[in-house]
Each structure stands twice: as C-alpha cells, then as structure tokens.
Amino acid sequence: MNFNKLKFGATIGIIGGGQLGKMMAQSAQKMGYKVVVLDPSEDCPCRYVAHEFIQAKYDDEKALNQLGQKCDVITYEFENISAQQLKLLCEKYNIPQGYQAIQLLQDRLTEKETLKSAGTKVVPFISVKESTDIDKAIETLGYPFIVKTRFGGYDGKGQVLINNEKDLQEGFKLIETSECVAEKYLNIKKEVSLTVTRGNNNQITFFPLQENEHRNQILFKTIVPARIDKTAEAKEQVNKIIQSIHFIGTFTVEFFIDSNNQLYVNEIAPRPHNSGHYSIEACDYSQFDTHILAVTGQSLPNSIELLKPAVMMNLLGKDLDLLENEFNEHPEWHLHIYGKSGRKDSRKMGHMTVLTNDVNQTEQDMYAKFEGSN
C-alpha cells in the first residue's frame, strides 16, 4: 500500500468527535494540518479543538459528502459507523483506514472466524442463532461460557456470563434480541494489549506491550511495560492479523492470558485505543501521532521508545470530585479531561498518566487514592 503524502496545511476529516477524535486532532494540528470533525453532538469534545465542525448523524449521506469535499483525507475514531456507508465514502474519498476492518469487526462471529483463519489463537466459540443452540454451547464449551451479541456492544454491554443452568434464562433473553456468539469462559490471569501502527508502504511500528485491568467491563488502568514476558508472542499474533486485514493507521489487539499462561486474541480495535493513552507522555511518539503520520502518508518511526515506565488510569464521573481535591498535591499526574458535557458515574470523563521508576508503588498509590470510588 502506497499513497501520496499530504502536504502540511492539508485538511484531515475526522468522523467522530469524542475523546479519540480530539486527541487525533491535537496530534494533527501540531504537525500543521487542519481538522474538520463530524459528530451528531453539538458539544462533543473534538468540536473545540477542530478548525471546523459539522453537526450531523453518522448516516447523514449529505453531511458525509460535505466532509469528504472539504478534506484531503478522512479518518474515523470508532467502529460504529455503517460499514456499507463507509464503503461508499471510500469509493469517492481518500480514507486510508478503509472499510474492510470495520465490516469485519462489526460482527463478532466474522471477526473470530477471520482471526482463527489467520492462524491466531482464539478462545473456543460457536455461533448461537436461536435458543436451541444453547444446548450445543453447553455440549461444546461446557460451563462457564459467555454469550455475546454478534453486533454492537462495548465496554461489556451486550453479553452475559452463564455459570450454570440457573443463568440460562439470561442467555435466552439476549438471544431473543440478537444473534449471538458463545465463547468459553477463561480463567484469566492477565489482560494485555498491543498497539501497532501500519503506515505507508506496509511500514509497521509497535508500541510496548500494555498490561490492563478492567472493572465493571471498563478499562480501569494500564501499566507499561506489561509485567509479563509475552511481547514476542503477541507481536507474532499481530503480524498474522496484519496479513489478513487491509488497514492503514493505528489499531490495538487485546489479549487474554489464562492460568496456564496461554495467550489468546480477544478482539481488535481498528483505531487508537484507550490502553494506548499513556503513550502521549511516556513515548517519543503517541499512538495518535503515528496514526496521523500513517493516514497522511508520512513515514513512521522505525521503533517507539518508551521514555519511562507509566501507569495510566481512566477517570470516571465518580472520580472527578476526588480528583479536584487531590490534583494540586500531585504535580506528577499528567491529566487529560475530555470536555464531555454529561457527567455520569460510570462514564469516561478523562484519564491521567504517571511516569514512574516503580510501577508497583505507583499502582498501590493509585489504589489508595481511588479505591474508595471504584
């Protein structure tokens, strides 16, 4: 894949004005690019850092074409835009990320089948189209297993854990609303992720392996470098995925490590990812920098340098009062507040990163500060 480099001063369009779009825009602007963002929310975070804002729904064909006509290249911050709509845009405008990854990843079953065909190790799974397929799931996977909707769902939404026969009713309810995928429940020892950017002429740049902790299905914190030696194995798995999916830009592969120390691919995020936010302060290039370099046709750095180990923690609505009281006492906290208008207890409102020589102690300090609010 090779395409013309954008000159400085060119215009980048971003579909989606959330925090990822905002941080993309900030990276683009420091490189000399202009930014136009499209989002349905009049007060989305990216609006206030973009040069121009188009308020429209993501399926508004007229508005999407308006974005395309204004911009030299288009990127997107999430995978919830219609793959068919994106395909039509790709036929008319320069969208290096393409539509294939979105088309693939919007369907959990197709995603898992593709990952399996690519030779990566995935958790055993089966398709569940109707309630009678649950018997097959019990026979094939055994208890416990997880039922997930094929389409939609994020941060743990659209899934139920089936521990035993008593939980089956919840699974039946989910299947009544959507086709599903059942997958074996793993005894997870660690969750890790690997962020990678694919650029012009198939250039590949890896970030350090990231160790993640989730709470209530939402990312709570990320530690870099991961405290487990799985980098080489994770890179091997990601390279197999890269050969199977057409994509330009930054993306992240999430992994499970089970109690037997086996590494499994969980899912792919075809854009910059929450677990890579630490890179803004902790690396010589952030995941947003490399994404912008990739979609504008610029060369990527040969490698990413981790300047210092780091702990990144998400800040939810319920954390903000504590944060305001403590922030002045902690100059080591690199704070990012996204500027979202609606404050909810479980909504991601920002994140902070701490650079440290002792991630274990910093982790303990964060627990001591924020444990009571989580």
From Swiss-Prot:
Keywords in alphabetical order: ATP-binding, Ligase, Nucleotide-binding, Purine biosynthesis
Biological-process GO terms, alphabetical: 'de novo' IMP biosynthetic process
Residue intervals of the ATP-grasp domain: 112-296
Catalysed reactions listed for this entry: 5-amino-1-(5-phospho-beta-D-ribosyl)imidazole + hydrogencarbonate + ATP = 5-carboxyamino-1-(5-phospho-D-ribosyl)imidazole + ADP + phosphate + 2 H(+)
Enzymatic class: ligase
GO terms of molecular function: 5-(carboxyamino)imidazole ribonucleotide synthase activity; ATP binding; metal ion binding; phosphoribosylaminoimidazole carboxylase activity
E.C. number(s) listed in UniProt: 6.3.4.18
A GO cellular component entry from the record: cytosol
Signal peptide span: none
Binding site for ATP: 108, 148, 153-159, 183-186, 191, 214, 266-267
Gene3D superfamilies according to UniProt: 3.40.50.20, ATP-grasp fold, A domain, ATP-grasp fold, B domain
Pathway annotation from the record: Purine metabolism; IMP biosynthesis via de novo pathway; 5-amino-1-(5-phospho-D-ribosyl)imidazole-4-carboxylate from 5-amino-1-(5-phospho-D-ribosyl)imidazole (N5-CAIR route): step 1/2
Any matching Pfam family: RS_preATP-grasp-like
InterPro entries: ATP-grasp, ATP-grasp_carboxylate-amine, ATP_grasp_subdomain_1, PreATP-grasp_dom_sf, PurK, PurK_C, PurT/PurK_preATP-grasp, Rudment_hybrid_motif
Protein family according to the UniProt entry: Belongs to the PurK/PurT family.
Assembly with partners or alone: Homodimer.
UniProt xrefs under HAMAP family: PurK
Role played: Catalyzes the ATP-dependent conversion of 5-aminoimidazole ribonucleotide (AIR) and HCO(3)(-) to N5-carboxyaminoimidazole ribonucleotide (N5-CAIR).
This protein's name: N5-carboxyaminoimidazole ribonucleotide synthase
Organism of this sequence: Staphylococcus aureus (strain N315)
Lineage of the species this protein comes from: Bacteria, Bacillati, Bacillota, Bacilli, Bacillales
